């Protein structure tokens, strides 16, 4: 075969067609059917994607609708707020405008009032001036008339002139009275009364002295004369008695003063009218009497005889009565008119001249008395005017009257306006506004109506009286006219007529007086009725006019204030009503605007919905078109593929023929070479093996006569794109041929894909291999090597490969099967794993694990029990199946394939995991076996590194380059970074009433996560942290937790589908507190006393656990309470033998937490030491007890097969060789493990120094004794049973109840004897048990024996040194305290050390400390770490703030570290004099037990080498803080270490079949992994934990978790 003849399909050697193989047509049809199925599957996938797109569009539509609704709501709220602000602003403006208008209106009204007042004052001044001028004129006229009073006595005077004179006098008196009334209203009434009295006296005097008879011809009658003479005497007596009129005047004045009116504004106009009418009536009567008197006087003065007045009176009607406002000009005209009448009147003759002179003189005296009286009255008036009644007071009274009238008018106008406003408001408002009352308005209206009614009644009464007075006045006029007519009708009447005339005159006088009295009485009653409220307290002292005026002013002011307040209230009510009307109108307008806006928004949303619907239709159309196009393309590709297959089939036929030709040629060549070899056999010196080789070649050639070829269906299993693009998969390229060397040439190993060597060479290769692998590993390595043709070999090599090719057909068929899409599963690492610490020498391809890490697993487990997996940080490699557990029901099983489409086409061929697993061997064997060429045709050749640096980087960086070159797809990390950023597997764990813990699987380990609680940012966790615990929650509350990825700014622009996950949970109600942990029962120094210790529950600052207050702890023994401790922080108590109920049968001790709401559940029970009841009270020193129950499943058959029953002698250091050998034979695949080393104790009481770690290790490697300890039995060697020499101090015996799988080790060093327990060396069982979930330790001390670690045993560096007297030396106590601190777990909450020196010293020392104190203690040991990589936090870290706290270091640098890892995965340490944080995944701890080989220090824990310089630095670091002490294992199991079991059946305690008591039981499904604590109780239940919940589980439903490989 030549180089230019490639194989048709690659992957298998071509061979002639078998007779039983199907025809090409059937193969083509089968291929087409498969293609159609594939197309159908793709079509279904496209449909599924279309449905997902539709759902996505529906989700976007809903989001848009929700966002539109939110925007609309925000816009509505914004507009509402703007509208309210605008409404308030407009309302304020309207209020200000109304207030300004009111103020302007009030100012305008005041200006109008002031103008009106000024006008009224001007009018009043004008009227006053006119009245004063008239009064002065009348006074002047009266004086002139009085001076000329003698005109009646003249001879030429007539009766008419006398009457005219009397009329003028009457008018002057009337005008004088009204002048006084104009000046002072009170003085007018006084003068009127006085004038009335004088007028009456004057009239009486006239009537009495002028009753003459008409003149008769006969002589005068003496009786008449006597009668005429008597009146003068009476007149003299009357006129001369001036005191009588004075007294009358005083009485009338006092009467007038007593009835003075207090409210002149109401009664003054009416009174003025009535007084005017009275004055008019009196003036008429006075004029008549004066006329008669003047006539009689003229008759008397006449020289003729006296004649009667009726005879001499003229028949003319009486003259017109003068009016009050008659001017002086009118009086002069009247006087001029009356003069002719007087002249024409003739005096009656017959009277005696002397008599007439005497009468005239008497009349003149009477007139003088009257004149004097008038002068006195005038003087008195002037005196009173000067005394108190000034013009200013009168003007003030008048101004107050006018002001009152104006205010009354204003009040009436305001009432009208208020009534109009109220009517308007009632029309505008349908209902009154609550809180406002109309009481003030109603009271104002009632007050106004009542006042108007009173005024109307008063005015009506006064008008009625005025009408009565007017009627009486008319009667008086009629009577006077009638009298005057009767007197002038006949000049000579008879005596009877005269008597009737005088009788009528007397009746008239009587009627007039009665009418005057009636008027005065009515005025007095009205005045008293109006002035009841203002009556003076002192009735005897009359009120002065000034006080009356002041009281009137005060009353007016009070009334004015009331009216002002009423006006203000009405104004406020009117403004409020107007404001309510405006608000209502504004609300109406706002509602209209809002309705319009909502309609517009609705229209917009409707348009948007229509647009979205249209877009969805268009999208569906486009999707259909795309699907049709894709189907058409697929059909075209299928037809093209069919054509290619037909062509390839023809080519395959040609190839078969060519191969047959090559085969025949090879056979001929083989025969020729056989002949040549036979010829060479007979040559001397040729080895005998040549014949055997020739025979083997001939047999191979004969067997190769039946060549086998894979069928077409098997060849077409490869993916179509791979077959179309890639050439035949042969790792030996034509350009770079590889010559396979002879097996005897050396230990080099050819390519894994090459099968040119025969099967017989495989054992030879295994023999020549220098590696110490087990047979199963080697067989699995060779079984997974895929075969491939090398087209550029010579003919001899092809002939040699014929038979192996036929035998490797099953391998080829398996290697060329269809690459199924790898099944991705999510696993959880149960415990930590470091491949460098294991027995395997090829650990470069294995992944280091940390407990709690998530591992993505591809495919199924291989035959060696390894998975192909990848960590979240991108590292890939092999994962032991016994260290991880699958997460059932994980959504990530299908989530990653949906999110990353590039994972689908990538296939892992069969055995590829082995290529990765065994590829790690190439890195370790590259210097011994040579170069290995691994990769695809189109990839570059990957050369194995020759240095340790290359191997280290390949191990820690996940062999990325090797994975890429070995056809492994790397889309997982990129897919997670691009598609799966949201945290997955968000789960809830450890939910209490006040706290909860969440965990998640990081979608991307490169970015930090933000934890939200109820949609509020709670905390920012750094990258790599996948759990968080909430504290301070409220019991019985629903919380919503969301965990999201915080992306950098450059990635925020990318449209991620989701970057967060949400979880909702409810905290339980504040229930019973949590039970205590780590209950331990130990011996006390006193016999018969037990020490029960526990770890107190975690309480908050308020002293509560699970939401309730903790009060103490109760100790139960087999379910019976024996004692209580009333302390929430107590950690131990003493239990005496007498307190046990049934001492010999008591086994379990449990502790409960007490609270006010009851007790908690039982803690994990602790076993009472079995030797407690059989222990003698006189023992020298009670032993330390530690019970370590670790029931992990082990291979008990192999343990039984081992002969471990030999007993060890007290001092035989070499008696453990044979049992150890037998034990190791039972487990051939295991490697020697390190053992627990304890320093020897001083036997003679002297100070004994502890052995160093190297010496102790060497010593214990030599002195080991194994003893089989069956379960539930005491150890064969107890304290006191071994030979103890006399004189030696008692030893400290560390013993306990043995557990299955433990081997009792007993060794003696010097005189000290130490027993310890070590677990058997079964690796898989050890790994499974170590990484099972278990309770973290909380109690470590000298009283316990640290259990052996599974990879390196925790070595104890200090010994307890006690002298013979039981005392402890200071330096030993110091060393022991430091050792206890180093052994204490950083996360532990309590450290207990029990000192048991001598039997007489019964001392128990308990030390406790918080985690903070342990971590921050200055005595914490210093740990030394080695940097594996360069670290620059400012360049690598995403968070710049966190980068400032990290330390920068270089690869190979030694770092000093204090404490353990924090929650974020960082150490606290020192580098180059700087303190800060150190990432835990970039450093490795340097153990003290390093060994020096060839000038380099080797670290057995990690496989790194240290140079001498680094070794010196290490010694300097450790010596600076004292001798270095390694830290103990942080995962040391406590009492009843949890056991992992699997549920065989479904179990739901809530249904009726499982029983009624469902509380406190777990719900399980078949296959669930349950962590069990403690043994089975008396009811057949385990106490276990599953999914973060704890409860009881039936024991018959659980099975032990099987061990792989058993």
Swiss-Prot record:
Compositionally biased region (Low complexity): 17-27, 688-699, 769-780
Q: Region (Disordered) spans which residues?
A: 1-27, 41-70, 217-249, 295-352, 677-731, 744-781, 1234-1255, 1364-1392
List every position bearing Phosphoserine.
Answer: 263, 274
Source organism superkingdom = Eukaryota
The yes or no answer to whether the keyword Repeat is present is: yes
Q: Which SUPFAM superfamilies match?
A: Fibronectin type III, SH3-domain
Asked whether the UniProt record includes Ribonucleoprotein among its keywords, one would answer no
Q: Which GO biological process entries does UniProt record here?
A: fertilization; spermatid development
Q: Which family does it belong to?
A: Belongs to the RIMBP family.
Q: Which UniProt keywords apply?
A: Coiled coil, Cytoplasm, Cytoskeleton, Differentiation, Phosphoprotein, Repeat, SH3 domain, Spermatogenesis
The protein's name is: RIMS-binding protein 3
